[in-house]
C-alpha cells in the first residue's frame, strides 16, 4: 500500500478469502479467531451473520474483515462434512436441487462497523453415484460448507449460480472492495 496504512486483518482461516483479497492487492494479516461455529440455534442467514460478527469482534485491529458462509438446503444448515461419508450424503441431497448460499461479512474500520449478508442461489445438476464418489475421493469438499467448492473441482457439479459467484466461494468481493475503497482503504 505504501501509505503506511495497517494491513487488512482477515479474521478467517479460509485460504480462499485470503487469496481473493490478495489478488486485489491488499496486504493481509490473518488472525484466526477461536470462535465456536457449532450449536447456535439460528436460521441459516442469521447464523452466517452471527458467526461473522463473533469472528470480527474476537480480533483486534483498525481494519478487520470477518466472514462466514452457510449452505442452506430448505432451511437446514449443511456445514463442513465431518468425514467422506457425510460429504457423500450432502452431495446426494444437493444433487439436482436448488440451495442457497449465504455469506455474511463484518467489516470494522476506525470509524464504523459494516455488516451485510449476501445470498446466491445455486443449482446442482443431477449427479450419479460415480460422480459423487469421484468428487468425495478428491477430498476437496471436506473443509467447505455444504461439502463442495464451487471454484475448484466442484465446478463440475453446478448447473448454474444466480447471484454473485464469489458469495458462493466465501466473500462478495466486489461489495467488500467497494466498501473499502469508499473509506479510503485502497490496495
Curated annotation (Swiss-Prot):
Its cofactor is a divalent metal cation. Belongs to the Maf family. YhdE subfamily. SUPFAM superfamilies: ITPase-like. This is dTTP/UTP pyrophosphatase. The keyword Lipoprotein does not apply. It catalyses: dTTP + H2O = dTMP + diphosphate + H(+); UTP + H2O = UMP + diphosphate + H(+). Nucleoside triphosphate pyrophosphatase that hydrolyzes dTTP and UTP. May have a dual role in cell division arrest and in preventing the incorporation of modified nucleotides into cellular nucleic acids.
Amino acid at each position: 500500500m505504501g501509505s503506511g496504512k495497517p494491513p487488512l486483518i482477515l479474521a478467517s482461516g479460509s485460504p480462499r478469502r485470503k487469496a481473493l483479497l490478495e489478488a486485489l492487492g491488499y496486504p493481509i494479516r490473518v488472525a484466526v479467531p477461536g470462535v465456536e461455529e457449532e450449536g447456535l440455534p439460528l436460521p441459516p442467514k442469521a447464523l452466517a451473520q452471527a458467526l461473522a460478527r463473533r469472528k470480527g469482534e474476537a480480533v483486534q485491529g483498525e481494519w478487520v474483515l470477518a466472514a462466514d458462509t452457510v449452505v442452506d438446503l430448505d432451511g437446514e444448515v449443511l456445514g463442513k462434512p465431518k468425514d467422506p461419508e457425510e460429504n457423500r450424503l450432502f452431495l446426494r441431497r444437493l444433487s439436482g436441487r436448488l440451495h442457497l448460499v449465504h455469506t455474511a461479512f463484518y467489516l470494522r474500520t476506525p470509524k464504523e462497523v459494516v455488516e451485510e449478508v449476501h445470498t446466491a442461489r445455486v443449482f446442482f445438476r443431477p449427479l450419479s453415484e460415480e460422480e459423487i464418489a469421484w468428487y468425495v475421493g478428491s477430498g476437496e469438499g471436506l473443509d467447505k460448507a455444504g461439502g463442495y467448492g464451487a471454484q475448484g473441482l466442484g465446478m463440475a457439479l453446478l448447473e448454474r449460480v444466480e447471484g454473485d459467484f464469489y458469495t458462493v466461494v466465501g466473500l462478495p468481493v466486489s461489495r467488500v472492495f467497494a466498501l473499502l475503497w469508499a473509506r479510503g482503504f485502497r490496495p
